């Protein structure tokens, strides 16, 4: 990522980085960025070329036709001292035009730069004719040296061009949108969307070669997806359901601190705005009609896009993951997903999230207002008139320049806050991994899912009828108000309870109908137990069964992964939320009228519905008690360290229970172990006494007693928590083991409840954020190993916080399992990040055809 660091004027980090980060850093020292000496030489070359170009330019000005020079238009490029092709500055009014209006002919040919080939202004349909390039060359040669040629001869040239375009216009009538409006940029009156946006579909072979050279020479690329409605990724609303029509790429000719002046709110770009940067439109929507030219265009576009994903220069993109996923969806069916593993684009949303993790989903407009202190409005265009196209192209061009400036500003802030290394090493390499995960589909057993949905639906009806019967009346079982009236108004169960303090609602201070309350009342009357089962069955059916069916496409599903969705650094998933699917099966009574096995109870496990592809096996790799191990490392508690540093033949939580309650380990019951586990994680997650009481099903006083006894046994944990809170009070933020930050402004609040909440969040973040860092690092290292392997084909399909789920070829399971174990457990010591944990990391591996039926892998595979 050296290109990215050079782009914002940073020095290469002195600390040795990971292989991925080193690759990033090495690019920043590459020759693609001109140093001051080379930049000066290139500038001189451009000046000489520009000066000579005046002799062979045709400028239409004040109704006078200027003469052409004697040079061949093929010489519109110059060789730099390094022997590479470099674009020269584009004059403000030099572009190829064939336009006749009001008896006046204006012909102009671009003297230098890519525009002579990228933005020809003849009628665009004529430009697609096979002989158009030859006609243009012939037109130029005929006019060389004829300074006093009569305008009528040029008029005849235009008429020939115009007649050809009329023939071609019949063909392009098929390319209209379904609403009857011609889809831009296929409009009849111009090949380009205004003066800023060029369509690569209409380039000849020479122009295509020049475009590829320009891409390779660009100091930076700024890209955005363009949707069918004319909006882009920079629009305020995310276009989750919009069809991608194309991709716009801004080629930055130089980098550095830009002094771009933004127009006033809602204002348009000035007409005379001149820039040396180039902006191209890459059409990706396929025509329903087969055409050899369409095939050639698709191949050219594929080459451009995959080169963009592998280029050395920085690629700036807002929501870069969506860009990578789109390219893979369009052209990545041949195993080319491995080629995008090296893509590390600069995503300003990720950068802004690292600076302020509480702002999890800002729009482009929000970030510009927040960090550049400018007000802009990104509006899609729904009309395709010439004026609208010009405005649209100027707006897209301008917004991409603003996006570049925004990203450079955020990169500077990352460096100032000490977050640049985390950005380069952890977050940016994760972008293509998440894109590949979204592009890969997980097969689902649809028939079993529909059968399970019917079974759960039948059971819900039975539970509802039973609840009405024991309540003595019908009521809405999902209505908390009606349930409260039955439980406490009619049945008076709160008066029968032996607990003095029953849970109440926060605002109205009414008796609660929460799970904790129902658990405390279920021995007093059958209704609370029925309500608990109804809620459990309803959640499984609505969320994990019917919810999955809603997102299923062609027998499989694929979640959307959010990199910036949490304040702790954890990943989140939606559509569907695969992370929320519990691994613990539930047992329900089988409906009396439901056909099937004769057992009285039925076991439901939503994870069993996820099945591996034919010839493949699921492999799950789970960090064992990673947060507890991090707590032991950070606190330095001798009892916890001893627990993990010695042989782990016994269960960790059983051993903790034995130590805490001072009982032999063989006398530890399952209930004792679960109680210890909940107490431990209440400390890790910063849960309050009330939350712990609800989890344990005890009073707040009892929960307080459990917590105090635990902290008295492991005193260093309490000392660690107090140290973290003190540091947060003084600095205003806390950090993870890899430097991730979370500002907590409420740590100094006058309100005691707000301050206590911030203190719990501080301790929680340090532990949970550190665990998230290690899990992300494991994802990156394993994905890199697979991408660089000539044989391994394993795909990461899901991340459930501490667990990574892979789909592996059956024959590769032993080799891949050994690789995964070695990489994940080696993260105990990462020299490149100056990380050295005091406790070992342990990984549990399990395999199976179904996600819900995984069996532990034999330990021998871990040492193979």
From Swiss-Prot:
Keywords: DNA damage, DNA repair, DNA replication, DNA-binding, DNA-directed DNA polymerase, Nucleotidyltransferase, Nucleus, Transferase. InterPro entries: DNA-dir_DNA_pol_A_palm_dom (IPR001098), DNA/RNA_pol_sf (IPR043502), DNA_pol_P_Exo (IPR040940), DNA_polymerase_A (IPR002298), RNaseH_sf (IPR036397). Interacts with FANCD2, FANCI, PCNA, RAD51 and HELQ. The lineage of its organism: Eukaryota, Metazoa, Chordata, Craniata, Vertebrata. DNA polymerase with very low fidelity that catalyzes considerable misincorporation by inserting dTTP opposite a G template, and dGTP opposite a T template. Is the least accurate of the DNA polymerase A family (i.e. POLG, POLN and POLQ). Can perform accurate translesion DNA synthesis (TLS) past a 5S-thymine glycol. Can perform efficient strand displacement past a nick or a gap and gives rise to an amount of product similar to that on non-damaged template. Has no exonuclease activity. Error-prone DNA polymerase that preferentially misincorporates dT regardless of template sequence. The gene is Poln. This is DNA polymerase nu. Its main location: nucleus. Inhibited by ddTTP. Its EC number is 2.7.7.7. Residues 169-179 have a biased composition (Basic and acidic residues). Residues 169-188 are annotated as: Disordered. It comes from Mus musculus.
């Amino acid at each position: 990522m050296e290109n990215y660091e050079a782009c914002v004027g940073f020095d290469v980090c002195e600390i040795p980085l990971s292989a991925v980060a080193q690759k990033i850093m090495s690019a920043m020292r590459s020759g693609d960025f001109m140093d001051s000496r080379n930049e000066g030489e290139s500038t001189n070359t451009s000046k000489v070329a520009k000066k000579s170009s005046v002799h062979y330019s045709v400028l239409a000005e004040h109704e006078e036709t200027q003469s052409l020079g004697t040079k061949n238009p093929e010489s519109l490029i110059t060789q730099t001292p390094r022997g590479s092709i470099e674009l020269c500055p584009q004059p403000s009014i030099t572009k190829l035009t064939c336009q006749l209006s009001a008896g006046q002919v204006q012909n102009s040919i671009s003297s230098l730069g890519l525009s002579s080939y990228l933005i020809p202004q003849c009628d665009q349909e004529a430009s697609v004719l096979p002989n158009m390039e030859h006609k243009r060359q012939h037109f130029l040669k005929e006019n060389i040296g004829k300074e006093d040629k009569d305008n009528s001869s040029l008029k005849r040239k235009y008429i020939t061009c115009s007649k050809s375009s009329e023939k071609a216009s019949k063909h392009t009538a098929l390319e209209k949108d379904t609403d009857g409006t011609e889809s831009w940029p296929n409009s009849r009156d111009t090949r380009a969307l205004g003066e800023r946006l060029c369509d690569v579909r209409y380039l000849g072979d020479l122009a295509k070669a020049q475009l590829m050279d320009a891409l390779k020479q660009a100091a930076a690329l700024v890209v955005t997806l363009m949707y069918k409605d004319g909006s882009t990724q920079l629009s305020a609303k995310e276009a989750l359901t919009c069809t991608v029509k194309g991709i716009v790429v801004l080629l930055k000719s130089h980098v550095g601190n830009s002094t771009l002046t933004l127009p006033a709110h809602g204002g348009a770009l000035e007409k005379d705005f001149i820039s040396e940067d180039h902006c191209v439109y890459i059409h990706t929507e396929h025509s329903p009609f087969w055409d050899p030219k369409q095939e050639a265009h698709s191949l050219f576009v594929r080459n451009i896009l995959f080169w963009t994903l592998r280029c050395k220069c920085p690629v700036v993109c807002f929501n870069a993951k969506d860009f990578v996923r789109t390219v893979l969806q369009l052209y990545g069916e041949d195993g080319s997903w491995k080629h995008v593993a090296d893509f590390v684009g600069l995503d300003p949303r990720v950068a802004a999230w690292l600076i302020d993790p509480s702002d999890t989903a800002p729009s482009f407009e929000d970030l510009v207002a927040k960090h550049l202190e400018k007000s802009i409005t990104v509006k899609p265009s729904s009309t395709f008139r010439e004026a609208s196209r010009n405005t649209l192209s100027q707006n897209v061009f301008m917004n991409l320049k603003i996006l570049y400036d925004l990203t450079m500003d955020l990169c500077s802030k990352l460096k100032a806050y000490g977050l640049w290394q985390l950005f380069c090493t952890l977050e940016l390499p994760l972008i293509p991994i998440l894109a590949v995960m979204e592009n890969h589909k997980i097969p689902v057993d649809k028939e079993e899912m529909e059968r399970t949905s019917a079974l759960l639906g039948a059971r819900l009806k039975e539970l509802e009828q039973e609840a009405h019967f024991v309540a003595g009346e019908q009521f809405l079982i999902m209505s908390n108000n009606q349930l409260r009236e039955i439980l406490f108004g009619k049945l008076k169960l709160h008066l029968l309870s032996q607990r003095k303090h029953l849970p109440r609602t926060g605002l109205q201070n009414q008796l609660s109908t929460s799970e904790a309350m129902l658990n405390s009342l279920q021995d007093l009357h059958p209704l609370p137990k029925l309500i608990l089962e109804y809620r459990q069955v309803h959640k499984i059916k609505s969320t994990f069964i019917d919810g999955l069916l809603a997102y299923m496409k062609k027998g499989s599903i694929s979640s959307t992964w959010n990199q910036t969705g949490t304040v702790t650094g954890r990943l989140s998933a939606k559509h569907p939320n695969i992370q929320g699917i519990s691994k613990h099966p539930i047992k329900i009574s089988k409906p009396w009228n439901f056909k099937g096995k004769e057992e009285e109870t039925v076991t439901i496990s939503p994870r069993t519905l996820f099945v591996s592809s034919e010839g493949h096996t699921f492999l799950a790799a789970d960090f064992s008690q990673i947060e507890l191990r991090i707590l032991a490392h950070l606190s330095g508690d001798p009892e916890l360290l001893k627990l993990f540093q010695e042989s782990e033949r016994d269960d960790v939580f059983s051993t903790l229970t034995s130590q805490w309650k001072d009982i032999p380990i063989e006398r530890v019951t399952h209930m004792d172990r679960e109680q210890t586990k909940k107490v431990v994680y209440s400390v890790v997650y910063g849960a309050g006494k009330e939350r712990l009481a609800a989890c344990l099903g005890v009073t707040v006083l009892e929960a307080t007693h459990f917590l105090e006894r635990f902290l008295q046994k492991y005193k260093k944990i309490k000392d660690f928590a107090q140290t973290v809170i003190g540091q947060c009070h003084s600095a205003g933020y806390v950090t993870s083991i890899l430097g991730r930050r979370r500002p907590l402004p409420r740590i100094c609040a006058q309100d005691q409840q707000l301050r206590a909440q911030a203190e719990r969040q501080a301790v929680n973040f340090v532990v949970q954020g550190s665990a998230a860092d290690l899990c992300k690092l494991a994802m990156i290292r394993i994905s890199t190993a697979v991408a660089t392997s000539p044989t391994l084909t394993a795909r990461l399909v899901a991340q459930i916080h501490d667990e990574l789920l892979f789909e592996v070829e059956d024959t590769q399971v032993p080799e891949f399992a050994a690789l995964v174990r070695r990489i994940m457990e080696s993260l105990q010591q990462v020299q490149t990040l100056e990380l050295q944990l005091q406790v070992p990391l342990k990984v549990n591996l399990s395999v199976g055809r179904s996600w819900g039926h995984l069996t532990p892998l034999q330990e021998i595979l871990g040492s193979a």
